[in-house]
């Protein structure tokens, strides 16, 4: 080969970087970059999505290590911040002129739409992390032109920087808008920390076209946990459901969607009427003809702005947003009772406005010339109403409340202010997370109040004594562990609700949930309450132990016992200081959405026809609400299975010959190649693991078990915990993850 002339010449012509701009091994155009190309999800669209367990990594957070937003917010002079917002609201900008010379109504819509994505079903959405800055929310049809509202606030954000998050600023601007226009607000709390990427865990629906709703309704029933009647809307279509201008029909959809946001009829009427006391809608012309792409689809030169409007000036009197045009009152920048005055004073007829959308005007030209134009002082208009406004008059229940507010304006103002506070703070969790001088002192039931600890807390000696008493009760590892897990695992990182503090697992509705095995739960609670009573009565001072603390301590005892039996002496961390909520402090209806449809950690899956998600998807969803990482989810499930901590005491997924011990047997056996697995149910939800040689069934498992051998990412983690030399690490990692779950709601420790 070396004597071959052509070969010699080829070898002589070795490519050198300075001789050519084109490497022969990397020829051709560079069309795609890292992250592009056909993805795994393109090939396998049903692949389990574990990305929701690795959101908001420190790798994407631009703040310094150790940055504490709560402390930064506390350093603000809130009155000075508010004054800057007041001043900004009446300083109209040429690039986006203020209606009536006041940006207040615009900021109210912005704040409302930031918070209004919240839904009580899973606690996701809401204003808590400033998600309105990111797609898809920044490009929802219902959020049209709110990109301008946020940009108008940039001077304030720029001035206060890291001390004022976007999430807090959006809500604060809404509060300031109300105050600037004459309404006393119920309060404001800061503490919403920004995130730096779009939320991946929120299911907004399965539709692939904006404003569609063909996937979310099975007949008249809205898919759970969705809170909007159409893809890309906050609540309902203001023209009427599916564009049908029927106020009575629309009322039922309003009731459902606002109910999904945890609002009752009284609060719903207050919010709609109060919000529509201010400002106007915008539909100067047909949006389909004149409005261009939303921010996420706009060109790079648009610099984050979307919905470019080519009609007239594109702003001011020519603005197109919802496609509906008009104002509700003749004082759109002042708080008043005129919304109800107009609603009841006029008879209304349905028309199509200049934007081509259904809207309502007073019959017989009544009210003409009473409403000022937003930009031209020489023009006057009649008031208008949306189809959904007329629902407040034509639905019998809404009408009663509307008329009551009409006749009692002071109550209306208070009801609206309180409902607004609930709207904008519903996802902030317990009041101890609220920051700032305007936090209301009044305790509200929807805040899931827990009494302050007003007694001396147990010390290490007391803890050791109580642990011995729990051990001597004869309660099993399974009973101790599942009770503590059931108490703590109600926590939702989405809206910061649930958790072990308050001890609400002993109260309705949690004490009746199937997943908590009510009969067994009652036995455990009765036993622990006897220990609590004996301990508290034996104290000469103010020292007490709460049942909330005892439940968690009992779980720690169970884990320690399981570890010791497996040969590991350890002490599970325990931090006392929880208090006991009462039944009167517990809104049963509001707690019902926290009941799990599934808890893969206890191998519980409710048999519901409308739950189409797989067991493994529901497991990951639960893990995300518990703020767990992939390894934490994995080690917790494996440990729970080894301890036999299924909700009903079943053997499903308990892949061990020594249940009740904290071992890594689950992982060893799920990785065992001497087994073959076969579905034992038509629905492929339960499986038998048989000896490959004899065919004898050795184990039974659910999809939430088998996924750790099937999914390549989870199998990789399972392999770490399934080796012969890892049991000590497994126990350590389990205890760390367990302690995390037990303290998820302990904001006093953070």
From Swiss-Prot:
The cofactor named in the record is: heme b
* UniProt entry keywords in alphabetical sequence: Heme, Hydrogen peroxide, Iron, Metal-binding, Oxidoreductase, Peroxidase
Query: Which SUPFAM superfamilies does the entry link to?
Result: Heme-dependent peroxidases
Covalent link Tryptophyl-tyrosyl-methioninium (Tyr-Met) (with W-112), residues: 235-261
Note how many cofactor molecules are bound and how.
Answer: Binds 1 heme b (iron(II)-protoporphyrin IX) group per dimer.
Q: How is it modified after translation?
A: Formation of the three residue Trp-Tyr-Met cross-link is important for the catalase, but not the peroxidase activity of the enzyme.
Question: What residues correspond to the site Transition state stabilizer?
Answer: 109
Enter cross-link residues for Tryptophyl-tyrosyl-methioninium (Trp-Tyr) (with M-261): 112-235
UniProt xrefs under Gene3D superfamilies: 1.10.520.10, Peroxidase, domain 2 (1.10.420.10)
Residues annotated as binding heme b are: 276
Gene Ontology biological process terms from the UniProt entry: cellular response to hydrogen peroxide; hydrogen peroxide catabolic process
GO-annotated cellular components? cytosol
EC number per UniProt? 1.11.1.21
Q: Which reaction does it catalyse?
A: H2O2 + AH2 = A + 2 H2O; 2 H2O2 = O2 + 2 H2O
Active-site positions on this chain: 113 (proton acceptor)
Q: Give the Gene Ontology MF terms in alphabetical order.
A: catalase activity; heme binding; metal ion binding
Family that this chain belongs to: Belongs to the peroxidase family. Peroxidase/catalase subfamily.
What function is annotated for this protein?
Answer: Bifunctional enzyme with both catalase and broad-spectrum peroxidase activity.
Q: How does it assemble?
A: Homodimer or homotetramer.
Listed name of the protein: Catalase-peroxidase
The scientific name of the source species is Christiangramia forsetii (strain DSM 17595 / CGMCC 1.15422 / KT0803) (Gramella forsetii)
